[in-house]
């Protein structure tokens, strides 16, 4: 669980009978010790729902709950309430509102809670024109990657440039666009095959595997294997390559549908800030 009580003051109350528990609206009229929550990688419960055809959030790329999902990235003002986030314009449908209001539900007061009916939708654009949405958008993205295109994917915190790691020519085009001719790139691998694709490319110790699966979804340096399965041009002359697992439900779906490793690097020219706005990516 990511929820931990932080009690700054307590006071015993004698003769008081408590009948229920409520989360009241935040007060903004007085200063207080406010903590900004970080973004969290998608949890196992949400991954299970994401892959369950019987679940109403099946393959919904923005699934989240109180244990996972974006926080810091969504905040426009404090305190951290839905009305102060970029989710404010998405009115909850009756089913999501019921979950949000139910203290026994793991989405109780999960501020970014949403579903395919009431939440953000997935779009695929080319040259500033929307080509497809939702499942068709995901399929179009996978097709573009398989055809050797470099794709900008909007994740939590900003855009990634992604391409087929097994296509050296495409990797070089990505390097040229990013103006990063030699520095190592990182690879993102699917989870659906039990890390089989990962084990074909690198050798991982038990400790490195554990680090890879930790909540931070960090990049782990691993020893490259020799042979035909080794991607070319990823970390020239290093003998090691940075590997990571999908951290968001969108990346989870994309990597699983693609079925192999993708180069994943921030969508900015080396040394410049990460791109977060759609218009900035379209102009770059």
Write out the residue ranges for each language-model feature.
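Conserved short beta-strand edge segments in small beta-sheet-based binding/regulatory domains
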Residues: 2-22
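Short basic, glycine-rich beta-strand/loop surfaces that mediate nucleic-acid
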Residues: 1-2, 221
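Active-site-adjacent structural elements in enzyme catalytic cores
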Residues: 22-284
């Amino acid at each position: 669980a990511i929820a931990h009580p932080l009690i700054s003051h307590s006071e015993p109350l004698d003769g008081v009978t408590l009948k229920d528990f409520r989360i009241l609206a935040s007060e903004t009229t007085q200063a207080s010790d406010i903590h900004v929550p970080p973004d969290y990688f998608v949890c196992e419960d949400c991954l299970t729902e994401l892959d369950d055809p019987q679940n109403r959030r099946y393959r919904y790329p923005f699934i989240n709950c109180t244990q996972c999902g974006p926080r810091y990235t969504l905040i426009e003002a404090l305190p951290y309430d839905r009305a102060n986030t970029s989710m404010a314009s998405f009115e909850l449908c009756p089913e999501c509102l019921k979950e949000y209001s139910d203290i026994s539900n793991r989405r109780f007061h999960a501020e970014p809670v949403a579903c395919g009916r009431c939440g953000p939708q997935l779009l695929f654009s080319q040259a500033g024109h929307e080509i497809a949405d939702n499942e068709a958008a995901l399929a179009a993205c996978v097709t573009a990657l398989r055809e050797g295109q470099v794709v900008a994917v909007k994740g939590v915190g900003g855009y990634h440039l992604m391409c087929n790691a097994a296509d050296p020519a495409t990797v070089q085009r990505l390097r040229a666009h990013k103006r990063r001719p030699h520095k190592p790139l990182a690879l993102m691998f699917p989870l659906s095959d039990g890390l089989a694709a990962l084990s074909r490319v690198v050798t991982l110790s038990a400790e490195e595997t554990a680090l890879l699966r930790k909540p931070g979804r960090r990049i782990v340096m691993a020893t490259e294997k020799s042979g035909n399965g080794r991607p070319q041009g990823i970390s020239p002359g290093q003998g090691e390559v940075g590997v990571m697992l999908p951290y968001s439900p969108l990346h989870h779906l994309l990597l699983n549908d693609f079925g192999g490793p993708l180069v994943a690097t921030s969508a900015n020219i080396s040394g410049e800030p990460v791109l977060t706005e759609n218009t900035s990516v379209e102009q770059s």
